[in-house]
Amino acid sequence: MSNTPIELKGSSFTLSVVHLHEAEPKVIHQALEDKIAQAPAFLKHAPVVLNVSALEDPVNWSAMHKAVSATGLRVIGVSGCKDAQLKAEIEKMGLPILTEGKEKAPRPAPAPQAPAQNTTPVTKTRLIDTPVRSGQRIYAPQCDLIVTSHVSAGAELIADGNIHVYGMMRGRALAGASGDRETQIFCTNLMAELVSIAGEYWLSDQIPAEFYGKAARLQLVENALTVQPLN
């Protein structure tokens, strides 16, 4: 046990940054509502940073903050703020002004190449080959997600496509996050806190006992979540 009541350690987190290109709160609110509707499992109640570097018109910050918060997003900071008055308004509300890392210069465009002949379309897949620990959230937009290691309780996997877990699955798995009801979840050891396909979900105590801790395949059949052995 540590001899001190607290300990400070460096860490890093993956956060979504919302770049504001419009100073009208109502316009921002509607745009965010539309975006959240596309991937509610990933964006609903998500922590975000607001980047205001592209705003040229004066901003009613109180109204803007309320408009963003009304969507369910949780504003944890603001970046890209160069206006002293706006900084003061933001800090008065208790939000930190964050400094982003320097943007890298764009790489030169590659030389044009002749199109390949007889190529076969390849489905994009996000591959994670390290353990997914508690508190981590991994999202695979517009593609499948494959995890070749264990997923701890408190971790969250989200994919617009299918989810494959080739290890112990103790966290939450949400496939078809953008609404695709044809997606599936494949686990070699199903011990999940929650499984969801296109919004249809089971909590851990709803997973049939005969499949708990076993290799399983989940999919929607007639709009209901089902599970069968993974052969």
From Swiss-Prot:
Xref: SUPFAM superfamilies: Cell-division inhibitor MinC, C-terminal domain
Claim: Cytoplasm is one of the keywords in the record: no
Annotated GO biological process: cell morphogenesis; division septum assembly; regulation of cell division; regulation of cell septum assembly
Cysteines engaged in disulfide bonds, as pairs: none
Pfam family, one: MinC_N
Positions of region (Disordered): 102-125
Alphabetic keyword roster: Cell cycle, Cell division, Septation
Alphabetical list of InterPro entries matching this protein: CAP/MinC_C (IPR016098), MinC (IPR013033), MinC_C_sf (IPR036145), MinC_N (IPR007874), Septum_form_inhib_MinC_C (IPR005526)
Subunit note: Interacts with MinD and FtsZ.
Entry similarity comment: Belongs to the MinC family.
Function of the protein: Cell division inhibitor that blocks the formation of polar Z ring septums. Rapidly oscillates between the poles of the cell to destabilize FtsZ filaments that have formed before they mature into polar Z rings. Prevents FtsZ polymerization.
Protein name (Swiss-Prot/TrEMBL): Probable septum site-determining protein MinC
